[in-house]
Amino acid sequence: LHAQEGAECVLYALALGDVRPPPALRRGRRAALVDQVSALGTRLRLPLLDLALATLRQAPPERRPVILKQLRTLTARRRDQDLLCWALTAIAERHLGAPHRALPRPDIHRLAAVANDIQVVFSALAWAGDSARGTALSGFQRATHGLLPAGRLLLAPERCTPNRLDPAIARLARLTPLLKAPLID
């Protein structure tokens, strides 16, 4: 993880999850590294991602877009259905991509205007925290208490796809700072 090639390989292996890697990652040292990452299971994905990104942030600026392009190519089919794949890709893009543009102007002044978006994001977080329905429901209810109108329920996992998360997060970014605070807390 301290060498750029190893860090790239770990990043790609994490994003692929249990999908068979492409030929370039099935040979030599890369294949061994992919196998090691797969054997570690899911609990170490985020710590491994942190270590890999720390190394990749030191990569030459002209190499970073290449890494991101390869990552997007590897994850293109899965990113829209697999929440973890989407999250890993988004984290890598944030750390390795070009500096972010300014935040959108806060023009949403009521939580009710973004209730659907809150429901999508917090449902995804609840399912990511625990796949057992009872635990996910309990977590969702605790997190959204006072944020959502009565009657808003935990969405099924298939309704919390990255296709719905991206626009929901973009709309929540437009909330005024005072309304963002309870969402973050």
Predicted regions and their residues:
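Small-residue-enriched hydrophobic alpha-helices in membranes
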Residues: L1-A76, L83-D185
